[in-house]
């Protein structure tokens, strides 16, 4: 069956997360419904990351197998039309034909996330549900120093949800940087994979560091404790964005049969 890779953007606010839900809207469910409306096929779409309820994405990647071949741009445009008609806060930014050995989840080399904090006295209006509003100022340089205690290969038991289903709490964190531009503090995290609630746990702990409630040494001690109780509060989902997925430099596009290179009559 022809396989397609898609880059997907979504506002996570109205959804119960990426993964299909029985009792609530999901991003995966919205995309699968759009495919069903377009093609009549019931398909399963696999994403590179299973974002939680309220988490946004500007560069989620997914793959899908369809019974017929498509020009990728036509598939993108058609899916966007059906998503718009359904009132979904989801958009397909790009589509590409790929070989069957491409897997959006398991072919990924690195995943990039961004967490946004806005520090100001007034509540958020335009950025409501787009960032974590903190009414007191934070020391972003102290936050960055504390963040470096977490970079590298560690047992991240302290920073994962008690409901995390990963077999091992050991992960390699390639990057955890904290920068500031005016009222906006950005936390950028990169790794091949993350544990459930790991980045939001980082953000909550780094906020404490920015307030002066934890030193960089305290953050290192929390990591080494391997105890969830040593973690700071889990930051709200509003500020978290799935930014990008890196794949091997060369993923050969799937060659389409010559007979299917012609434009569709309809």
UniProtKB/Swiss-Prot annotation:
Enzyme class: isomerase
Cited Pfam families: PseudoU_synth_1 (PF01416)
Single GO term (MF): tRNA pseudouridine(38-40) synthase activity
Active site: 52
The protein's Enzyme Commission number: 5.4.99.12
InterPro entries: PsdUridine_synth_cat_dom_sf, PsdUridine_synth_TruA, PsdUridine_synth_TruA_a/b_dom, PsdUridine_synth_TruA_C, TruA/RsuA/RluB/E/F_N
Gene3D superfamilies: Pseudouridine synthase I, catalytic domain, C-terminal subdomain, Pseudouridine synthase I, catalytic domain, N-terminal subdomain
Subunit structure: Homodimer.
Function: Formation of pseudouridine at positions 38, 39 and 40 in the anticodon stem and loop of transfer RNAs.
Identification of the protein by name: tRNA pseudouridine synthase A
């Amino acid at each position: 069956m022809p396989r397609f890779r898609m880059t997907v953007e979504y506002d996570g606010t109205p959804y119960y997360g990426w993964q299909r839900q029985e009792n609530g809207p999901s991003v995966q469910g919205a995309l699968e419904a759009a495919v069903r409306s377009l093609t009549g096929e019931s398909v399963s779409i696999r994403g590179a990351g299973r974002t939680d309820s309220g988490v946004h994405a500007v560069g989620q990647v997914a793959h899908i197998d369809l019974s017929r071949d498509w020009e990728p741009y036509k598939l993108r445009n058609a899916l966007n039309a059906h998503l718009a008609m359904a009132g979904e806060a989801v958009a397909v930014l790009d589509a590409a034909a790929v070989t069957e050995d491409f897997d959006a989840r398991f072919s990924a080399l690195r995943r990039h996330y961004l967490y946004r904090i806005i520090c100001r006295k007034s509540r958020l209006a335009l950025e409501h549900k787009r960032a974590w509003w903190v009414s007191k100022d934070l020391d972003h340089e102290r936050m960055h120093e504390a963040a470096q205690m977490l970079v590298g290969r560690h047992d991240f038991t302290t920073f994962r949800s008690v409901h995390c289903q990963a077999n091992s709490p050991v992960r390699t964190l390639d990057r955890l940087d904290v920068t500031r531009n005016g009222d906006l503090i950005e936390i950028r995290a990169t790794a091949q994979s993350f544990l459930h609630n790991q980045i939001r746990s980082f953000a909550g702990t780094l906020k404490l560091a920015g307030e002066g409630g934890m030193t960089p040494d305290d953050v290192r001690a929390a990591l080494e404790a391997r105890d969830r109780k040593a973690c700071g509060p889990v930051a709200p989902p509003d500020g978290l964005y799935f930014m990008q997925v890196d794949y091997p430099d060369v993923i050969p596009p799937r060659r389409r049969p010559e007979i299917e290179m012609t434009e569709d009559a309809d």
